Amino acid sequence: MRALTAAVLFVAGLTPVLAQDSSPTGPTFPNTVANCNAWYTIVKGDGCDTVEKKFKITPEQFFKWNPDVSTDCVKNFWVGNSYCVGVGKVVSSSKTSTTVKSSSTTQKTSSTSSKLSSSSKPVNTTTTPYSTRNPVTSYNLTQPYTATSLPPAKTQSGQPAYCNQWHWVGTGDTCLTILNLYGSRLTQEQLIIQHSEATALARTSYSVPWTSSQGNATVPAPTDYTPPVKTIVANFTASPQMTGVPQSCQNFYQAQDGDTCDVILKQFDYISREQFFSWNPALQGNCNGLWVGYYYCVANFATGVIPMPPTVTKVPDGAPTAINTCNKWYQAVGNDDCDAITTYFGTFSKSDFIKWNPSVYQDCSGLKTDSWYCVGIPGTPTTRTKPLTTTSLGSLPTQTGISASCKQYWLVSPSDTCASIISNAGVSADDFYKWNPALGGSACKGLQPNYYVCVSLTAAPTDSGSTTTITGPPTKGSNPPTTTTSGGGGGTIQTPSPIMPGMIGGCVRFWFRGKDGASLFCADIAKDAGVSLPDFLKWNPGVGSNCESLWADTWYCVGVSGKPTTMSSGIPTPASK
């Protein structure tokens, strides 16, 4: 018998032997099949596919035997853990631990007809996990938190004390998923107003319907949300902007910190990269060359060729199902409303849109950003039945009460505050709140994203007695509106372009920071110009209090009195020279 065993081992040694073990040598997962009799411990470089190939098993077999591993092999596939690569007879026992004698198991190899025999020793199997990634310790399972009083203990601050219905925020929840769940009785504005920290949704807010055994709480009547009334800025011009932008540009985008052309093209996905660079030639094809605060052209189409909004023909997740014949869907963005969507497409009426999408309600108050809506059924035209009318740059929303003499505006972003606008625009707080009464003073409760606020007036006084007057858009070319300045020392001058955002009104002395001035920073510029550093920073607030945003190829104010001058090369000189 020993001779026969030796012969078998000798023959087996001549063939490739798979690196499998009869028992795991590393930690295992609890749901691995109980009748596993072949194990493999993962090493660096392994993947599910390489293991399947190595042991000549199918993916279905591997994932069936190792159900804790995700089918994309991303979750629970760990180096050092043991996984099942072969099974024997199914073990069936009601006991926690059983001893099973396995019969001789054979496995044929592709290169030889010899057989590999497994050990005939008893194999101890158990239905209880016996290995973990960390030492087993005793722990107590606590019952999940359940609210027993109003309000629940795990809530975020700032929520109404009279609330009597709550939602537990789970993994994957967003404001949109919550609104979709309670959309019949909750609007986006109500959610935001009632949850001052809703933008920081985390798994800390517990929310389930709760009924008091002592009777219903007295709930004040709800206060309807009234959005600010939109008015139109009739004399707005996108400024500052880089040279070469076509005067016929129909729509602009103001670059934010961190923007690249890829960010813009994703937002305005109806234009191509080539179109964007042709409308903004100063970029010279540099996708990362955007200047924060500058306006870039994102639409300059000939009449009648404005592209249709992007749509999909495959039913997206979360799409409405009220119309089972819908064959085209559109995802709402930004400031969309029913009128705007109807106008953009020009292939259906507003009543059609509401009928296809009843979740928006008759007054369109249920329309939600990022949600999908039906925009086509069989028979809907594929091209506009009437041309899309483009609006001038003046169609920009401002809040009520804004100063009628305002000439420079600031588009409020979601991250803006009154303090940040005052700092970046270089205006005084008193003037800012006086020009924008809808903000509610220093409390700044009325500041609304995607609305314009006033940051400069006509004839704004300066210490030198000079005044600034906007003369309107240029008659040719693409520069921003010119500024004619009357200096205290006599003479007039036009503000050059481009300038830093927020430059003081009434500047009469300008210096261009070109290649020959690239080594100069705020303190150097102020010293050469014969002005104090605090004055330079006050006149050019866009550079930042630490001169961290000093731009090349840009004009800077170096004087608000003296003879009007533009210094386009070299270093700045004092007004006395």
From Swiss-Prot:
Residues carrying covalently attached carbohydrate according to the record: N124, N140, N216, N235
Biased amino acid composition, Polar residues: 122-135
SMART domains, A to Z: LysM (SM00257)
GO molecular function: chitin binding
Reported induction: Expressed constitutively with no significant difference during colonization of banana roots.
Signal peptide interval: 1-19
Alphabetic keyword roster: Chitin-binding, Glycoprotein, Repeat, Signal, Virulence
Job description of the protein: Might have a role in sequestration of chitin oligosaccharides (breakdown products of fungal cell walls that are released during invasion and act as triggers of host immunity) to dampen host defense.
Domain text: The LysM (lysin motif) domains are small globular domains involved in binding chitin in eukaryotes. Lys4 contains 5 LysM domains.
Other remarks on this protein: In plants, chitin acts as a microbe-associated molecular pattern (MAMP) that is recognized by lysin motif (LysM)-containing plant cell surface-localized pattern recognition receptors (PRRs) that activate a plethora of downstream immune responses.
Protein name as catalogued: Secreted LysM effector Lys4
Source species of the chain: Pochonia chlamydosporia (strain 123)
Organism placement in taxonomy: Eukaryota, Fungi, Dikarya, Ascomycota, Pezizomycotina
